[in-house]
């Protein structure tokens, strides 16, 4: 009986189905990748718009538009109020003008009389004022031209000059002491302000350094978190690739299992038929050989017995030969019969083996169906788990990507804030340095101006004193040469400053 074989187109059909499934998987993976890319692009656009709408510039633009609209509304209300107020004032002014016109019409004569009285009063007041001025001028003229009063005034002037000079010296000393105290106070105030500014700058520098350290620590933590997220993303990508390889490996193992099951069925069928045929043939051959050996021993015993009895019973020898030949013929006939029976038995065994094989094949088919169903459920469950893990991996990658973008934006904002804080710190340092330099320059200018003014005052005082001494000497010399001459007009004497 020939062994069952499978058609050649089955294997080619299997390979075609396998390639088709692989292409379908690749198409499905590519579609999934395009869907993920489209999803990420959509989220990027959404995030950029969200950032733009929630940015400070958008907020300032909205608040500026709101304030402009509010100011326009307030201006419009104020303009309406002003118009209403002007309208009321115009009506009131018109009423007042009408009343005033009425009064003018009624009191024109009374007004002329009042004007005449006012003119007369003004004329009397001018006359009175002229009299007073004339009296005052006459008094001053008498006061200036009276010799006794002039001598008295000269004595008072000398006393005043002497007292004023001493007073001026005392005031000069007090002024110098006051200026020294003021300079000392200003120096102390300047030193205190400088110490306060230095302390404030130290505190600000410490605060800025602390903020820098905290910001650097935050940036370092964010960088570590970013590295961790990148490692998680790499791990998730590797895990996804591993899951895809496991999925392809399961499909390959399933295909190999089906092929091995078909090959095993063919091999088992051939092995069973061959083993059954060989076992029956060997067993029957041994039985025939044993029977032939038994028959041979029997015939040999008969022949030996015939030789022993040849001398005793010569008459019976022929009969023994005839019996031996007959037995040999019977054995040969029996051997032929056994061979025919063996052939018939072998044919019967093949049919029974075929029936047994068909029976076992049916049992194997049922068992194979059950095993295939169980394996299909197991493989389907495993594939479903792999797909769920792939989906979870995709979502985890999306979350990791979002968090990574958020961290990158936070890092950029941190860098911008650090740069802005650094620029503000530099500007503040420069402003404080310029302020201190301006204070120092102002203080030096004040000291220089005070010193210059003091020198000028001393020089003016010295020159005034020299000029006064020269004038006094010259006047004394002139008066001594001319003698006493009365003066008609005197002049106002003042003390030297």
Swiss-Prot record:
Native organism taxonomy: Eukaryota, Metazoa, Chordata, Craniata, Vertebrata
Region annotation (Disordered) ranges: 167-188, 441-497
Gene Ontology terms: cellular component: apical cortex; centrosome; ciliary transition fiber; cytoplasm; desmosome; keratin filament; mitochondrion; plasma membrane
Annotated function: Tumor suppressor which has the ability to inhibit cell growth and be pro-apoptotic during cell stress. May act as a 'capping' or 'branching' protein for keratin filaments in the cell periphery. May regulate K8/K18 filament and desmosome organization mainly at the apical or peripheral regions of simple epithelial cells. Is a negative regulator of ciliogenesis.
Protein name stated in the entry: Trichoplein keratin filament-binding protein
Organism: Mus musculus
Region (Interaction with keratin proteins): 72-457
Oligomeric form and interacting partners: Interacts specifically with keratin proteins including, KRT5, KRT6A, KRT8, KRT14, KRT16 and KRT18. Interacts with KCTD17.
Listed transmembrane segments: none
InterPro entries for the chain: CFAP53/TCHP, TPH_dom
Tissues in which the protein is found: Expressed in all tissues examined, including brain, liver, small intestine, large intestine, lung and heart. Found concentrated in tubular structures within hepatocytes, and in the apical cortical region and desmosomes of the apical junctional domain in enterocytes of the small intestine. In the hair follicle, localized at the outer root sheath. Also expressed in blood vessels (at protein level).
Subcellular location: Cytoplasm, Cytoskeleton; Cytoplasm; Cell membrane; Mitochondrion
Domain of life assignment: Eukaryota
């Amino acid at each position: 009986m020939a062994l069952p074989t499978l058609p050649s187109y089955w294997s080619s059909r299997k390979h075609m189905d396998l390639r088709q499934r692989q292409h379908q998987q690749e198409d499905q993976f590519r579609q999934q990748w395009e869907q993920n890319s489209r999803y990420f692009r959509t989220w990027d656009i959404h995030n950029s718009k969200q950032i733009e709408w929630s940015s400070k510039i958008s907020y300032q633009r909205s608040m500026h538009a709101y304030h402009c609209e509010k100011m326009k509304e307030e201006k419009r209300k104020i303009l309406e109020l002003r118009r209403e107020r002007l309208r009321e004032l115009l009506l009131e002014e018109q009423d007042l003008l009408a009343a005033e016109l009425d009064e003018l019409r009624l009191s024109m004569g009374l007004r002329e009389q009042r004007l005449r009285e006012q003119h007369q009063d003004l004329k009397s007041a001018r006359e009175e004022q002229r009299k007073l001025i004339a009296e005052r001028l006459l008094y001053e003229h008498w006061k200036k031209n009276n010799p006794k009063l002039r001598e008295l005034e000269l004595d008072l002037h000398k006393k005043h000059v002497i007292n004023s000079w001493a007073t001026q010296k005392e005031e000069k000393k007090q002024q110098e002491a006051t200026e020294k105290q003021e300079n000392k106070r200003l120096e102390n105030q300047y030193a205190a302000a400088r110490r306060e500014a230095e302390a404030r700058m130290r505190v600000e520098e410490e605060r800025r350094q602390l903020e820098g350290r905290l910001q650097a620590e935050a940036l370092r933590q964010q960088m570590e978190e970013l590295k961790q997220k990148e490692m998680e993303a790499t791990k998730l990508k590797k895990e996804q690739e591993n899951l895809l390889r496991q999925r392809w490996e399961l499909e390959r193992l399933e295909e190999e299992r089906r092929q091995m099951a078909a090959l095993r069925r063919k091999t088992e069928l051939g092995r069973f038929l061959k083993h059954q045929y060989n076992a029956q043939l060997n067993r029957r051959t041994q039985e025939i050989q044993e029977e032939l050996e038994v028959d041979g021993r029997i015939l040999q015993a008969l022949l030996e017995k015939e030789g022993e009895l040849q001398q005793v019973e010569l008459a019976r020898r022929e009969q023994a030969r005839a019996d031996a030949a007959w037995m040999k013929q019977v054995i040969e006939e029996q051997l032929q019969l056994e061979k025919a029976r063996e052939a018939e038995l072998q044919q019967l065994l093949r049919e029974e083996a075929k029936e047994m094989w068909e029976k076992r094949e049916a049992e194997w088919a049922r068992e194979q169906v059950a095993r295939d169903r169980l394996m299909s459920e197991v493989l389907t469950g495993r594939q479903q788990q792999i797909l769920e893990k792939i989906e979870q991996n995709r979502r985890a990658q999306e979350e990791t990507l979002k968090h990574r973008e958020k961290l990158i934006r936070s890092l950029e904002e941190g860098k911008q804030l650090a740069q802005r804080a650094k620029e503000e710190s530099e500007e503040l340092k420069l402003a404080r340095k310029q302020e201190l330099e301006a204070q120092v320059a102002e203080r030096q200018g004040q000291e220089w101006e005070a010193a210059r003014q003091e020198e000028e005052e001393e020089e003016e005082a010295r020159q005034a004193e020299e000029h006064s001494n020269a004038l006094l000497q010259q006047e004394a010399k002139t008066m001594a040469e001319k003698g006493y001459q009365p003066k008609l007009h005197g002049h106002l004497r003042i003390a030297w400053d």
